[in-house]
Amino acid sequence: MAIEVFSFFSGLGFMDLGFEEAGFDIAFVNEYNHSFIQAYQYARRNRPHRPQYGYYEGSIEEFLDDRVWNQRFPDYDVRNKDRIIGFIGGPPCPDFSTAGKNAGSTGKNGKLTEKYVKLIVKRQPDFFVLENVKGLYQTKKHKIFYEQMKKRLYRAGYSLFDSIENALEYGVPQFRDRLILVGFNRRRFGKNLRYTIGTNKTYEMDRIKMCNWPTVEPFQIGIVRNEPQDIIPELTVEYWFRHNNVENHANSRDYFNTVANNKFVSIAEGDTSKKSFKRLHRWRYSPTAAYGNNEVHLHPYQPRRISIAEALSIQSLPVWFEVLPTLSLSAKFKMVGNGVPYLLANGIAMELQGWIEEHMD
C-alpha cells in the first residue's frame, strides 16, 4: 500500500524524490514559482508516475478555501483504514535564517510557515513533515513563533516530534543543519505515541568529527591530491564528483563564465572561512550549499565556480537528475541551493515509512 503525499513548496522536488524512493506516492505537487514547476517536471520526464491530483502553480493559501479544496480533491475525506494521506513541505526559510533576512514570522517568506500550519490544522492529514532552517528553532525570537505553531498543531490533534538533523549524517557531502518537525494525527494513530527522528542515519556526528579532515592547501590548477587517511571518502566532494560523473553530466557546463578574477586562483583549496568565495576541498565535505546572496563556491582545483552538475552532486542527487537547460543560471543555482538534500529527505522518509507500517490499524 502506497501512502499518499501532498507536497507543498515543492521546488525542484528533492524532498519529494526522497519520499518517492522510500515508497511514498506523491499524489499532488504545489509550487508557486512557474520555473520551479517546469524544472520539477523536466527532471522527472523519464519517470512514468504522474501525481494523481496533478501539479498546481499557485499559493498554498488558496487551499484554505473550501470551494477550491473540494473541487481539486473531491475524495480527500473518503478515508478507510488502508488509505493514509500526509503533507510534506519546507516553506521558504530566509526570514528565519541567520544568513538571510532574519525578518521572522512577519517577513514575506516567514508568513508561509504559518499558512502551512493553518492548512494542516484545517485539512487534518494523517501525518505531516515540516522542514526548515535551524534558526526557526534556535533563535530566541523565532522560537517563540515556532512554539506557538506547535501549540496550534497539538491542539488540533497532533503528536509532535522535532529534531535538528545534519545532512552529513545521512551521507550527504555537505554540512547542513535542518529542523525537522513530524506530526501524527492522534485520531488516526492514537495517543501516547513514541517516535524518534534520526534512526536511519548512515554516520554519527561524533565519528565524522573524529576524522582527520584536510584543512587548507595551496591552490593549483589540476593538481592531483591523493585521498588522505582517516577520513570518510563517501562524504567528500571528490567522491561525489566521481560518483555522479559530473564532467559528463547534462549540466556540466552550467557555471558562470565570468571574466578572470584573481580570487579564482588566489583562494586556497579548502578555504571556506569567508562569507563569499569559498573554495571547496576535494577531500572534505562542502559547507552549506546556499548559492545566491553573493555566496560563491569555487571548484577545488579549477579556476572557476562550481557547476550545476557539481552542485547537484553536493546535494546528493542521483546521477540521472538534471535541471532544465533553458532556465537562467541564477535560477538554476537558486533552485538547487534551496532544496532539501536528497539523502537527508530519503532517510527521514524511510524511518517514517517504517513507523507508519508498524502503526497501521
Each PLM stretch: what is its role?
Residues 1-5:
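Extreme N-terminal starter segment of soluble prokaryotic enzymes
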Residues 66-83, 93-274:
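Class I S-adenosyl-L-methionine
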Residues 6-61:
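SAM cofactor-binding core of SAM-dependent methyltransferases
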Residues 89, 130, 291:
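Redox-cofactor binding/interface segments in oxidoreductases and associated redox assembly factors
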Residues 43-62, 68-86:
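Short, structured active-site "lid" loops
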Residues 234-361:
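C-terminal target-recognition/interaction regions appended to catalytic cores
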